[in-house]
Each structure stands twice: as C-alpha cells, then as structure tokens.
A protein has these predicted regions:
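N-terminal Rossmann-like NAD(P)+-binding domain of SDR-like oxidoreductases, especially those catalyzing
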Residues: 5, 11-203, 325, 337, ...
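C-terminal substrate-binding subdomain of Rossmann-fold SDR/epimerase-dehydratase oxidoreductases
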Residues: 40, 219-348
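Residue-level recognition of oxygen-bearing side chains
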Residues: 88, 119, 126, 165, ...
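A glycine/serine/threonine-rich, flexible loop-to-helix segment
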Residues: 158-159, 210-218
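Hydrophobic alpha-helix immediately C-terminal to the catalytic Tyr-X-X-X-Lys motif of short-chain
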Residues: 179, 183, 187, 217, ...
Length: 348
C-alpha cells in the first residue's frame, strides 16, 4: 500500500453517522488515484462499490493488480462497467442510492487526446453526464469529481488560482475537464446537487500510471533507453504525492458545499486546486530518479509537445482555508516511495 511505502498512513475518522452503513461509489477504482482512495476508505471500515471499465488505454494487468489488493476487503464490491453504458450506470445508482460519489474515472492523457478524440467524448462527457443523472435521480448528497490543472490552458499567471480564467484550453482532454466543471455547476444550480471539483496537479506515487512521465522515465532508465525530455527539459511541474491527494479527498467528503449568496451563482458547487504548491524542475526530478535507481539517464532533448505547457503551479489557499490541509510531501520522499514500489512491482 502507498501508506506503507511512505510510512505515513492517514486514517479517516468515523463519527456518529458511520459511513459503513451505506456504500460510497468510487469510479475508476482500478485506476491510480481511484485505487488509493478506495483503499483508504476501506481501511477506515467503509463500504465501497468500485466501478471500472478495465480498458486497455494502458496495461490492464496493472489495473487488475490494484483491484486484487482491494478485493479481500469485506466491504468492497466491484462492478465492471463502462461509464458510457447508460442503462448499466442508471441501474447501479438505482440499486445503491449512494450518498457520496467519488468520480475519478475518465479517459486521461493530453497526448492520447490528439489521436483518439472520441474516447474523451464517450468517457469524459457522456460518461460524466450519466454519473450526474445517477446522482440527480437517486438522492446523492455529495458528488466529488476529478477535474485537472490542464483547464488553465495557456494561462501565464502563476500560481494558478481557482479564480483565474479557464476559457482557453489547449487540448481536448482539458476541454472535457472544463466541460465537466460546467456540467457539474449546472446540476448544482438546477437540482441543488452539491458538487466538488478537484483540479489535480501531476499526481504521482506507488501504483502509478505507466503512461506518465516518471513511470516512463523509470522504465527507460532501467532498460538503458533514452528518456524524452520535451521543451529541451525546461519544464516545471507541481508534483503532488498520491497520499496527500487521498487525504484531501477523504477530508472533503464531509465538507458538503452549500449555496451561498454571491458565490457560484448561488449553486452548492466548489472547485479546488489539489497540488503541492511547489513546482519542481523536471531535470531535478530526473536526477532524483537517477539517484534512486542507481543508473544514469540517457537524455533525448525534444521541442515542446502540442497541447502541453511549460509550467504548472497550484495556489491551494482555498483548499487550506476550507479543510485545514495542503499537500506537502517533499519530492525526494515521494520519488523514493515511487521507485521502491517500481522496483518491487517490476522486480528490478
């Protein structure tokens, strides 16, 4: 488990109204963030229904390995379904009437959206609409959903604030995430569905996605292949450790947005940045990987990739104000935890 790798487990306090009596839905439960959130809830004794399509965007064996770690928990059940399957999603919501839904499933990846745009419409738009409809018709009291720092698009003002304009996405993936925020706000306004959107900033850690930079770099370094450094390595990212993200999500579960005059058009909707508020030079992170893996990287310098940005930097003051916590795991500790898991999983 991630908490074991970092030796910093966080437990969810269970108050008088124990959530074990009703199930929490976690979509994308076999995915990177979804697995960690589901496991944290189960560790605290909650009942969790995990949903995932187990598609082949990346190796399904890794998704199954995560799922295999959740299956032994007595409070866990798994539903194999696609978000775009409207009847299946409607039946699931009608059966369980989830009080809290944590929606982390999506078609991810900026670069993949350049070549497979319809995947994003199916999962991120139609699939999200099915989740919203399920919440609307079945008494959901709080929908927490994943947005992305990519919604800031071509913004040059740093750090990125939740009050900044997000009207100029530079990838289809970012456009679908912005659309999710607008759709959620609409349902909050029309149907008084409380929604909380989380703009994630470069989440990493054990059980990482193999299409992400740190994982790709680690594989290439261990196999003696070049690593591709876009913008000639002149990139800065607000790397955020997954255990910090899990803690944010679980803290926000009981912080249900309310309608406040003069805010968000009176809708019970909130959006937060979830980042480490401390951008790291990409070359520094590569050096940390080299140190932890004990091997030098062969570096291939390339121009900027379409749809990418040179820097991300999260302003998390709104998050800290409302939940009293901000991600803060040092990059050195996080990379060490990731590499420890990577070595163990790949036996290298």
């Amino acid at each position: 488990m991630a908490a074991g790798w970092l030796n910093s487990a966080h437990r969810i306090a269970r108050g008088g109204n124990e959530m074990a009596e009703t199930a929490v839905l976690v979509t994308g439960a076999a995915g990177f963030i979804g697995y960690h959130v589901a496991r944290e809830l189960l560790e605290a004794g909650n009942v969790v229904v995990g949903l995932d399509s187990l598609n082949d965007y990346y190796d399904p064996a890794l998704k199954q390995a995560r799922l295999d770690l959740l299956t032994p928990y007595p409070g866990f059940s798994f539903v194999h379904a696609d978000l775009s399957d409207r009847p299946a999603i409607a039946d699931l919501f009608a059966k369980h009437r989830f009080p809290v839904v944590i929606h982390l499933a999506a078609q991810a990846g900026v670069r993949h959206s350049l070549s497979h745009p319809h995947d994003y419409a199916d999962s991120n738009l139609e699939g999200f609409l099915n989740v919203l409809e399920g919440c609307r018709h079945n008494g959901c009291s709080h929908l927490i959903y994943a947005s992305s720092s990519s919604v800031y698009g071509a913004n040059t003002k740093l750090p990125f604030s939740v009050d900044d304009p997000t009207d100029h996405p530079i990838s289809l993936y970012a456009a679908t995430k912005k659309a999710n925020e607008l759709m959620a706000h609409c349902y909050s306004h029309l149907y008084r569905l409380p929604t909380t959107g989380l703009r994630f900033f470069t989440i990493y850690g054990p059980w990482y996605r193999p299409d992400m930079a740190l994982y790709l770099f680690a594989r290439a370094i261990t196999e003696g292949r070049p690593i591709k450094l876009f913008n000639h390595g002149k990139m800065r990212r607000d790397f955020t450790f997954v255990d910090d993200v899990t803690r944010v999500v679980t803290k926000l579960m009981t912080l249900v947005p309310t309608a406040e005059p003069g805010q968000n058009g009176g809708a019970p909707a909130r959006v937060y940045n979830v980042g480490n508020h401390s951008p790291e030079e990409l070359m520094h992170v590569v050096a940390l990987l080299e140190r932890e893996l004990g091997r030098p990287a062969i570096k291939e310098m390339l121009p900027m990739q379409p749809g990418d940005v040179p820097e991300t930097f999260a302003d998390v003051e709104a998050l800290f104000r409302d939940v009293g916590f901000r991600p803060s795991t040092p990059i050195e500790d996080g990379v060490r935890a990731f590499v420890r898991w990577f070595r163990d999983y790949h036996r290298v």
